[in-house]
Amino acid sequence: MGNSFRSDRVAVEIQREINDILRNKVRDPRVQDVNITDVQLTGDLSQATVYYSLLSNLASDNEKAATALKKATGLFKSELAKRMTIFKIPDLTFAKDESVEYGSKIDELLRGLNDKSEY
């Protein structure tokens, strides 16, 4: 049980640091609209899945951002090693956060229902 609390704290710290690294260290224009939304860690803190959202809905922008994030993984790990005081920095895997798009679609549907009820 204590391990879960620790992994949650480390995940929040990794999320904050990666967002900061994206804004201040990564100069790649393909990731300028990327925001880290969540980090999920394994119980032993060896693997981290980093979820990101993108302001653009274009598939080409998504592919470019995914490629750029994968390419910058080494930079993220080295910067995290400098900034964090944990024994081993977890291996990072990036995944697009689909919940943002899903929420937007639900919002759109609700607005559509609201518009129809006004007639």
UniProtKB/Swiss-Prot annotation:
It is found in: Cytoplasm. SUPFAM superfamilies: Ribosome-binding factor A, RbfA. The gene is rbfA. Monomer. Binds 30S ribosomal subunits, but not 50S ribosomal subunits or 70S ribosomes. One of its GO terms (biological process) is maturation of SSU-rRNA. It holds the Pfam family RBFA. It comes from Lactococcus lactis subsp. cremoris (strain MG1363). GO terms for cellular component: cytosol. This is Ribosome-binding factor A. Belongs to the RbfA family. One of several proteins that assist in the late maturation steps of the functional core of the 30S ribosomal subunit. Associates with free 30S ribosomal subunits (but not with 30S subunits that are part of 70S ribosomes or polysomes). Required for efficient processing of 16S rRNA. May interact with the 5'-terminal helix region of 16S rRNA. Its main location: cytoplasm. NCBIfam families: rbfA. GO terms for molecular function: ribosomal small subunit binding. Keywords: Cytoplasm, Ribosome biogenesis. InterPro entries: KH_dom-like_a/b (IPR015946), RbfA (IPR000238), RbfA_dom_sf (IPR023799), Ribosome-bd_factorA_CS (IPR020053). The keyword Lipid biosynthesis does not apply.
